[in-house]
Amino acid sequence: MSEFKCGLIAIVGRPNVGKSTLLNRLVGQKVSITSRKAQTTRHRVMGIHTTDEAQFVFVDTPGFQTRYTGTMNRAMNKRVRETLSDTDVVMMLVEAGRLKNEDRQVMELLPKDRPLILVVNKIDQVKDRAELMAYLQEVTAAHAFTEIVPVSAKQGHNLDELLKTLQAHLPENAPLFEADDVTDQTERQLAAELIREKVFRLCGEEIPYGVAVAIDKFEEEGNLRRIFATILVDRDTHKPIIIGKGGEKLKTISTQARLDMERAFDSKVYLEVWVKVKGGWADDVRMLRSLGLD
């Protein structure tokens, strides 16, 4: 009888390549925020998927930044490097048909002493098989990978094959978490991330990714969560964009975030959200530490 397998699996890749979407698909529910805006993932987020034979502990990482060099981005890049050094398997995500310089720069960081699984995402968007084969040849010439698995995170295509491939490379270990655990994030952390996701989705390109959410108060009373949060922006011009005419945009952000929280926490949620201008917060080490971003 085969032994139970369990290990840490890093999910790495350039910004906005689909890492958070893939993590949420593999786990079966939202544990990492997603949006069309690059750099929405700032924290290492563990997503956990357990079967009768194995436990997959996924560590999502920020997209490795090569364009921006501020304090926050340096801290996030440091976390990517730390994640690569303490996981059992590294899974790099690329976009089918598009090998960018940023992808090559991430490849340079990949360790040589553990299994490297290349996950080619968005294969549903490539209609020409010859084009896909040419792309795969380009990728394999750029770096040596242990395995290559094509998937569509958005459509859920070929994820069973990906899990099978990952399981083959996991070490034999007892499970690290309970069978029904799906993340190590606290409800407080997830609440902040869900609010930030709605800002990105509803404000589009009007707001840069320099937005943070601080949870000022989180109270539990039976089947009710009372959450008071502040959206931090670094420019005066961003505040009215998030608030919207007559406060309608902020109301929509709050409502959508609250509904997601109620689904995630399986409880009623009372949510109050404010917007505050805090210039230079992304370069303030003390502020980053208070937000868990140092």
Identify the function of each model-found stretch.
Residues 12, 16, 22, 45, ...:
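Residue-level signature of catalytic and energy-coupling elements of molecular machines
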Residues 18, 158, 249:
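Conserved glycine(s) of the Walker
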Residues 65-68, 100-101, 126-130, 157-161, ...:
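Switch/connector loops and helix/strand junctions flanking conserved nucleotide-binding motifs
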Residues 84-104, 113-131, 154:
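Conserved Switch II/interswitch segment of TRAFAC-class P-loop GTPases
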Residues 187-294:
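P-loop NTP-binding site
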